[in-house]
Amino acid sequence: MSRNSVAAAVTLSGLVEELRADSRLGPQIVHSAYLPAQAARHAELEPPLPAALAAALARGGVERLWCHQAAGVAAVRRRRDVLITTPTASGKSLVFQLPALAEAAAGGPGRGLFLFPLKALGQDQRGKLRRLAADAGLDEEQAGCEIYDGDTPAARRAAIRKRLPRVLISNPDMLHLGILGHWTSWGPLLADLSWIVLDELHTYRGIFGSHFHHVLQRLLRLCRSVGGDPVLIASSATAANAGQFAADLTGRPFEWIAESGAPREGRHLLLVRPDGSPYTAALRLFVRCLDAGLKTIVFTKARRITELLYSWLRRQEPALASRVASYRAGFLPEERRDVERALFAGTLDGVISTSALEMGIDVGGLDACILVGYPGSMMATWQRSGRVGRDGRESITMMVAMPDALDQYFLDHPQQFLERPCERLVVDPGNQPVARGHLLCAAAELPLEPRQDAAYLERHRTSLDELLRQGQLLQAAPAPPEPPGAEPPAAEPRPEGEIFCLRRHPQRLIQLRGTGNTYAILAGAAGAGKAAAGGEPGPGG
């Protein structure tokens, strides 16, 4: 155990004892548990990484790969689609960073398209990839990495299309509207595409997942049309059926790696039944953690509660006000980035957040997590708890129960809270209204061929037949025989059976995350898709 982790362990053990002995808070703690540390397990890659890349990793503290990282990279080398579901902070991103940088070091043609459901995740990954590439001696020509999303200025977009990077970072919304809808401008990228990264795969459930299934099918179809054959690399939170979910979402089987080789320090867990307001109890615990020198994150279930707790803290503990921030969707992107940077730099000691900080943006080393109410799923619970305890430090998670039945059940049955498996993920690729919209997009991008696209068309036969009946899709009939001596046709007739769409830009009719409504925000207005792509999903916003 490192010196830092020993110090943290002493601090956290002492804090738990102090809280239990506290005349006010002690009686409210109904259960405490300690989840012991896990040792690291390493594995070697054969053949090894390029020497310069291995040296860059070593300088960053990664002298050997953990076994799940090595297994993931090896699967990608074998051209296998791979799914990684190891815990938060287990280094999953190296599984997709290393193949791209190794290809760059070897001077190969392969390119990567890294898709993140939130813009902030893409910004975070670009910084990490660029730093690792520079440390390995790779320049922009060899290992360029660019972001192409709704915030990218028009002139910059044109420059990216003209000079394609090794890795293009985007999100599903921009892929749907800005890339697939204008795919002929991206032909060289699609032809050389070796890896498609699907980060935070568990977010693609429900109606968003139904849409994304079709966006991905359209992308893969266009890749095939120009000779591309990319491997899918997916990472996800732990789920009971992650492998089947990935197969349902993408239509392809995955090599599923769930066992982590990353070390994990011990974790303390407290379940709290407040004798009054859960918000007051959570605020008291927050202040105690900050006074103990612990970097702390509080997760609430609603934006209003986030701002309420932040307001109470500023009023009741003015000395702490400059050390704490709130974080939620509805903030402008730069406001959120400022909070993320301050947390990472250590200039903030605490943050009160909705689910917006649940996913893997790196905000540095946090020690304590306070859940104001059960988050609604074990998957979200462990995702949020996993935001603390990085960098070889022990951590503490406290759940302050709300008065509803499920929260109270877990307090009465704490082993259920500790042992309950994560939930199953559900996606419906066969959703017919969704399928109809994307069939129009696919046919507008590249006419559907009954032979080449047989599997896709058969899966959505009902939706296809309806669009043909309505005349929204058209199918080329056999060309009539030409009379002797007739002039050749001015235009080449369409191949028999080809299915095409005359509507221009049907992509604009589809919002992947909503219904196409417009939302008012502080600085103006944004369409539902753009607002959602720039915001943070979740019950609290």
Model region roles, listed by residue range:
Residues 4-11:
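N-terminal, positively charged, Ser/Thr/Ala/Gly-biased leader segments
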Residues 519, 526-541:
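Beta-strand/loop-dominated core regions that host nucleotide or nucleotide-derived cofactor-binding catalytic loops
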Residues 10, 16-60, 64-67, 71-93, ...:
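Helicase motor core with emphasis on the C-terminal RecA-like subdomain
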